[in-house]
């Protein structure tokens, strides 16, 4: 989370949605300061913000979850930065890599798993993420798919004149551009059940090649119920982790400067 008192804006950084690149640029160019944790949510900000800060312009990035699932798989498969094998990042040590993350990582590594095998094993419930706890509190939402244009528009709406383009950073190693190379016919129906409710809620579409799709009623109901439970858990039961990120990370270095 990045706050700028100069321009009176708050950026809520969501995982796998260019939060590092945007946070760094807001810090370097627009007086942005780290606030709480990298992926803190709006209700956490509300608990500590001043009355004037609650009036700040709020924005975040929304990304197609089909893309996010592929990105997560490729990051685990490559483990380029060693995140999934670094004990300092494990949740029991105050980090963000949970036991579930490590279970998925080990499954991919031990079985040389394809995306389709991984998806069948770990994606069984309707997909949801922190966007559902964030977007309703935003004054503007950047779509990841049009991030270059939307980023500039967000800054203009926040009162920045002549904002600079966002540098491209943090591309996922090994990731292919064609979604259909991942979402093959053998996981098409599962994908519709898993992603359908989220895509419909945020006006995303399945690949055109799939034609007209029907989202199962069971998935729609599960998505609604699990969404309510998720909000209650995040707001009232989830333990807050350390506000300080690791030294050597983009957010951690900003916090220490």
Feature names for model-found ranges:
Residues 1-257:
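Membrane-interface amphipathic segments in extracytoplasmic regions
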């Amino acid at each position: 989370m990045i706050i700028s008192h100069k321009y009176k804006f708050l950026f809520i950084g969501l995982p796998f949605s260019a939060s590092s690149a945007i946070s760094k640029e807001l810090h370097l160019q627009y007086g942005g300061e780290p606030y709480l944790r990298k992926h803190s949510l709006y209700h956490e900000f509300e608990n500590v913000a001043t009355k004037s800060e609650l009036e700040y312009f709020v924005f975040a990035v929304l990304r197609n979850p089909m893309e996010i699932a592929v990105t997560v798989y490729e990051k685990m498969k490559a483990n380029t930065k060693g995140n999934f094998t670094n004990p300092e990042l494990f949740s029991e040590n105050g980090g963000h890599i949970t036991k579930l993350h490590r279970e998925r990582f080990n499954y991919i590594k031990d079985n040389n798993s394809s995306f389709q095998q991984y998806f069948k094993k770990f994606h069984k419930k309707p997909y949801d993420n922190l966007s559902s706890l964030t977007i309703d509190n935003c004054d503007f939402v950047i779509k990841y798919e049009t991030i270059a244009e939307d980023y500039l528009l967000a800054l203009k709406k926040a009162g920045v004149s002549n904002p600079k383009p966002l540098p491209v950073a943090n591309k996922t190693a090994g990731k292919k551009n064609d979604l259909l190379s991942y979402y093959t016919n053998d996981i098409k129906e599962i994908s519709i059940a898993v992603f359908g409710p989220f895509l419909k809620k945020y006006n995303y579409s399945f690949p055109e090649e799939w034609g007209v799709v029907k989202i199962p009623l069971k998935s729609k109901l599960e998505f609604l119920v699990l969404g309510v439970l998720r909000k209650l858990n995040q707001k009232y039961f989830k333990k807050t982790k350390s506000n300080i990120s690791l030294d050597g990370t983009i957010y951690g270095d900003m916090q220490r400067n």
